[in-house]
Amino acid sequence: VRVDNPIQNYTVSPMRKNIKANVSGNQLSFAVDSAAYLLVKINDLEDLYLLINPKVDYQAQVSDKEIVNILSFGIDSTGTNKETEKIQAAIDEVSRRKAVLYFPKGKYYTGELYMRSDMTVLLADDALIMGSTDPADYQDKSLIRMDGVSNFRMLGYGTIDGAGWAGLRKNGAREFHLLYASNCKNVLYDGVVLRDPTFWNTR
């Protein structure tokens, strides 16, 4: 953990774990050998909560399903082009096939996406779904939208970025959701990082 100023004092809780840490200037380092929920206090800064979960092999969880690579739909993975329509077409097709839509390492720039039933979205560790900074790209004011969806999973250690502070707020977006779900059942999100919403992260 690195902070702006030299570290004068710190604690790593829960104390019963007796975690040994090293201080070098403005950096605090320590190791854990198992899953843990930790509270780190440094100087008079805000508390830092670390939620450390066991590494999950999400590929193994979908090994019995048909896996469809998003790149097979001719989608740009550099974040240069806005690919909303192509990504949505891929979602619709994979739902029809009751399969897994796989996003390999890359940046996928998009507007609002509507998830469908009977499918799994699997994000690689370095896969980033990056929201557009144009409010006009969000008809229903959400980046990931689920209405009446059932039997849906989004798995993996990738990231979904709502582009809130990245530009959407500056461009006039108000009360947008990063993830919105309504009247859904049997839905699971696991491992995925949801960051930088305009307003609500998950609703």
Residue ranges and their predicted role:
Residues V1-R203:
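Extracellular/periplasmic carbohydrate-active domains that bind, remodel
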